[in-house]
Regions:
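PAPS-dependent sulfotransferase catalytic domain
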Residues: 256, 290, 445, 449-479, ...
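PAPS-dependent sulfotransferase catalytic core
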Residues: 363-365, 369-485, 630, 634
């Protein structure tokens, strides 16, 4: 295997050969390089270009297939596939490849032009309207912004941000520049910045629907559902029959808890776009959240019947914990997984769905293989580094030493309303939330992002700054600022509450911010939902999360995260003695009554029988565990990880001494 610098040196030699049209010489060098660096996608891409110019079309397609196996969303590989098929006069395959290329990367002008030309040549000009509109928008954009779109599509976010900021300094009111910078901010987790940019964009250009839709999506991510719904209503009023606008409104209605309206609108869309797979899948999500599992299954299956490569629908079926795939469905999923043209995202969905399918069949080796593949796909797209979070946790402990905590015992907002349930995902937090929210004095909400958003705001300091100011900057905050942050949290979260005096925030990752919570909300209750490390970590590893939780994409990564979590919780116990109630999942399963009374006593609540029969709730539940918590206490999952123990040595080794706290 060559070093990266050696590969780059060969490519630097080859590029002038390509520009000079010396394709045979270039091909020879690139074939050798492809043997020495078989997974270098840029080298393979240049080889495929050479092969096309040499009319070695079959060889070019083989080379492009190699790229797509390594990187399924390599947009230029799909575009080059289109060029090859077009040279072979296979216009149908060419059209599909060009379409896939622009789905991944909207900046590929030649793929847009090629689609329009093919459709016109094959007497299908009625399908060119949207493509011509997209091309006109792209041609009208300043070249730097086209470059930004291209970099975003390649996940080169730092370069994209630098280029976009440089452009915006010269053109501060360019709406598309604002929209793209907001898109980068959203991907980097800077939701405050993204919201500000998009709010400004729609002020300058109220009729810019792309900016408004992006604004709605950011509002949803920040769980400002009321404003997101209002914006969706404004969008719909512009064109009530537009299925895209209807879909946005339906999704925001669902997020706001109005599932009847959402389902009604989804049905209206299906009258315009019969059996649209995306709409059917969203409809299935709404039905699932309402507890209508059978109807959800039907909706997901209809989506698959319409579009067999729709991986999200398959995974949505797998995520219905009480659902089992038929043999025919498993065969169909494997066939789609083997298809080269399928998107990276669909492949990921299919791998996790196949893992669940084979686990249900007790074929654990095969199940693990698919879980591992699914995580590998996610890992490729992730920039997560365990060392960065380890350092952040250590910084929390360094700032919140005993002296600092002693100086800040009387700070913050005195409201006792919040009950934080923290820990790792898949640790039983949904179970604890359902128990507590069944009490008459407690409102259940969801995983609220407000504390994470505050931490992110403190971390970034200036807008889109790359310098971290959290937690190191906390000692500089005044008592007034700390109180205001607490009051802001109470105010912002009120939209999710009913009339009960207490409410739950079950965002698991808030354990990282127990110090901050104690500074701004000293009377809040904090419950640490803990589960056996092997069970918790493997359950996270086999779960495909909608977003975030990047530490779950590898056994070593999730083991490191769990170990660091335990170490940080030990520190919080030391500096805030008695502040956090630890609830062990296995103990809740073994003795529900005792643990429920213990939890209620900690929260200062009288015992209510409804907390024991929590599974009778009619409330919408928005987590992967939603089917489980509608059943009496879920005992079968306590030792599921042992079915996979033969494959979990890397996890055991990473957890190290943490495992010694638990019986084997």
């Amino acid at each position: 295997m060559l070093k990266l610098s050696e590969v780059d040196a060969v490519l630097a030699d080859v590029k002038p050969l390509l520009q000079a049209g010396k394709f045979s010489i270039a091909e020879k060098k690139l074939l050798t390089l492809a043997d020495d660096a078989p997974e270098h996608d840029e080298a393979l891409y240049m080889l495929a270009v050479c092969q096309r110019y040499l009319t070695k079309h079959t060889a070019a397609l083989d080379t492009l297939d190699r790229i797509k196996r390594i990187s399924p969303d390599h947009s230029r590989a799909h575009q080059e596939t289109g060029h090859v098929y077009r040279a072979m006069n296979n216009v149908g395959a060419a059209l599909n490849s060009y379409s896939r290329a622009t789905q991944i990367n909207p900046a590929l002008e030649s793929s847009l032009r090629a689609q329009i030309e093919i459709l016109n040549l094959t007497n299908r000009s009625e399908f060119t309207k949207q493509l011509e509109s997209d091309l006109a928008l792209l041609e009208a954009l300043p070249k730097p912004l086209v470059g930004v779109i291209d970099l975003i599509a390649q996940s080169k976010l730092v370069k994209a941000e630098e280029l976009c900021k440089a452009f915006m300094q010269k053109h501060p009111r360019n709406v598309e520049g604002m929209r793209l910078l907001a898109s980068i901010g959203t991907r980097l987790g800077a939701l405050d910045d993204a919201e500000f940019l998009l709010e400004s964009a729609i002020e300058f250009a109220p009729d810019n629907t792309r900016a408004r839709i992006d604004y709605i999506q950011v509002l949803r991510k920040r769980q400002n559902y009321a404003e997101a719904l209002r914006q969706a209503q404004l969008l719909l009023e512009k064109d009530p029959k537009n299925p895209q606008f209807q879909s946005v409104f339906a999704v925001e209605s669902m997020q706001s808890g109005d599932f009847d309206t959402a389902l009604s609108v989804f049905d209206s869309i299906l009258e315009i776009l019969p059996e649209d797979p995306v709409t059917l899948t969203s409809r299935g999500h709404a039905l699932k959240t309402q507890g209508q599992a059978d109807a959800a299954v039907d909706s997901y299956r209809r989506a698959i019947n319409k579009y067999p490569a729709h991986g999200e629908a398959y995974y949505s079926l797998a995520n219905l914990k009480l659902f089992n795939f038929s043999d025919d469905e498993i065969t169909a999923m494997e066939a789609q997984d083997a298809t080269l043209g399928i998107s990276h995202t669909s492949k990921t969905y299919l791998n996790f769905a196949l893992g669940k399918a084979y686990e249900d069949k007790k074929l654990f080796a095969k199940a693990f293989t698919f879980y591992e593949r699914g995580n590998a796909h996610k890992k490729v797209q992730s920039r997560y580094k365990s060392s960065e979070l380890t350092a952040e946790f250590a910084a929390q402990a360094e700032v919140f030493d005993e002296a600092f905590v002693a100086r800040h015992r009387d700070t913050g907002c005195i409201a006792p309303d919040p009950i934080f349930i923290v820990g790792l995902p898949r640790s039983g937090s949904t179970l604890l939330e359902q128990i507590l929210s069944s009490h008459s004095q407690v409102d259940g909400t969801m995983e609220l992002p407000n504390m994470l958003s505050l931490a992110q705001k403190l971390r970034r300091g200036e807008r889109m700054s790359s310098t971290s100011h959290y937690p190191s900057g906390l000692p500089e905050l005044s008592e007034q600022q700390l109180a205001e942050f607490g009051e802001q949290f109470i105010s912002e979260t009120r939209v999710h509450r009913g009339s009960a005096p207490f409410f739950i925030d079950k965002m698991p990752n808030n354990f990282r911010h127990i110090g901050l919570i104690s500074l701004i909300l000293p009377n809040a209750k904090i419950i640490d939902a803990r589960r056996h490390p092997m069970a918790c970590c493997f359950s996270g590893f086999k779960q495909l999360f909608a977003e975030g939780q990047e530490f779950t994409y590898g056994l070593e990564e999730i083991g490191t995260y769990y170990r660091d979590y335990v170490e940080l919780m030990d520190h919080w116990d030391k500096v805030f003695p008695g502040k956090v109630l630890r609830v062990q999942y296995e103990e809740v399963v073994a003795d529900l009554d005792t643990q429920v009374r213990r939890i209620l006593d900690y929260c200062g609540l009288d015992f209510e029988e409804s907390c024991i029969s929590f599974y009778e709730t009619d409330r919408a539940i928005r987590t992967p565990s939603s089917e489980q918590v509608r059943q009496p206490i879920y005992q079968s999952g306590v030792e599921q990880w042992k079915n996979f123990e033969a494959y979990l040595d890397p996890l055991k080794e990473t957890l190290g001494p943490v495992l010694d706290r638990y019986p084997t």
